[in-house]
């Protein structure tokens, strides 16, 4: 873990970084010398904990050039780099650098949180949504970076419907991962102070009294919707973010709204299993087969072919009922695809 800068200049009210007065960078020459020493000692996996790696483009470019130079000198040496970036600030100089990295090296964590302008205003989040979408599209099409994006459910004023619209907008850009989080109460943040009695209705937030202080209801979503979303997020991790079911997810998410399609499956899966913790890949294969064929009316051969390709590609070795008689005698243990599949 390395840190080229500290602090955050943004004031998102749900985040403890909103309390920072400013952000500042450490001396660039000293930092690069320290990086060189780590690299010389064999370090190849660098996770930058900077809140905003692309805040100062001159510094970002120098750091990226440092790694490009070492990759050119030792192309056989594996390298992994993780950066957290703001999505609406990717000047051409930075894009030119990012485009030079080969697959498997860069992971970019891109916090979206919400595409709803009214919600963004309530939480003091400054984000150009059009530029954000344009830059994400560029990263998908012109870089080899693995894109980990984030959305938060339960922000003040965010309804189930508006969250669904934001999800669909993000999903259409095809990042590798969409992390679905639920708002937590962080003591001392501006949003926590706004949740006290007497605040406007959109800030009528109720949180669990036990850690991690997850929101239970807001002025825009009730307790049942929060519970539904928590289950949905768990299933999304198992199916989409795991990378195990890329082809099957293409079938599942067909329709005008990917979020609505997945929410329908999540509700059905909960009613059918009453389980979120014990769902093995084999149980998920069988559940997807039943749902896609019986509930969605898709052809059995199409569903089976997608599930078979996903299951064999994941390296799993058991025998789900839906694939009995279809599996090869020895399935290759390939694991999760390097770089992940697009969502």
Model-derived segments and spans:
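Short linear interaction motif-like sites in intrinsically disordered regions of transcription factors
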Residues: 15, 59, 139, 161, ...
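Radical SAM enzyme core and accessory elements
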Residues: 8, 231-343
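Conserved C-terminal portion of the radical SAM core fold
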Residues: 32-49, 82-84, 102-114, 128-256
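Radical SAM [4Fe-4S] cluster-binding motif and immediate context
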Residues: 1-141
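Generic intrinsically disordered, low-complexity segments enriched for polar/acidic and small residues
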Residues: 11, 36, 50, 64, ...
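Accessory C-terminal segments flanking Radical SAM cores
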Residues: 3, 199, 273-277
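Short amphipathic alpha-helical patches
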Residues: 58-62, 121-125, 193-194, 252-260
